């Protein structure tokens, strides 16, 4: 995720987020994930629309936990859904962040472009930001 952060030099903060969302009936499954991996938190997403149950999210944001626990697990036990492609992109983003690429303008653009290839409903605000457009790489720079 990209969020505005005035305290960062770039004005943006990037944080990877692995999320599994389930209804209340599957909350015990999320608790099993949390116990098995020994990391992450479970949050409630209260819904006030026409759905009758709230959703729960198992969320892991620590780069260390992602790179040492979550990614190795899902590389060994591959997803058998369309999410596998997104997972591979996510793993690449985490690797870039481990190498501190997200601290450079070029690295941030590269990560933003990778995020744009994932199953998303809308374009990243980072890519639409006037600051990002002004700092776009020259044609010779490849992202």
Language-model region placement:
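Internal intein/HINT superfamily modules and their associated LAGLIDADG
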Residues: 1-143
């Amino acid at each position: 995720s990209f969020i505005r952060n005035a305290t960062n030099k770039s004005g943006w903060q990037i944080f990877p987020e692995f999320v599994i969302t389930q209804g209340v009936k599957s909350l015990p499954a999320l608790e099993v994930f949390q116990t098995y991996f020994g990391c992450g938190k479970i949050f409630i997403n209260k819904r006030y629309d026409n759905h009758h149950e709230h959703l729960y999210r198992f969320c892991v944001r620590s780069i260390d936990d992602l790179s040492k626990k979550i990614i190795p697990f899902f590389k060994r036990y591959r997803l058998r859904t369309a999410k596998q492609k997104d997972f591979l992109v996510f793993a690449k983003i985490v690797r870039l962040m481990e190498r501190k690429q997200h601290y450079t303008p070029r690295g941030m653009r590269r990560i933003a472009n990778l995020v744009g290839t994932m199953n998303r409903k809308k374009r990243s605000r980072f890519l639409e930001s006037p600051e990002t457009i002004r700092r776009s790489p020259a044609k010779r720079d490849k992202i």
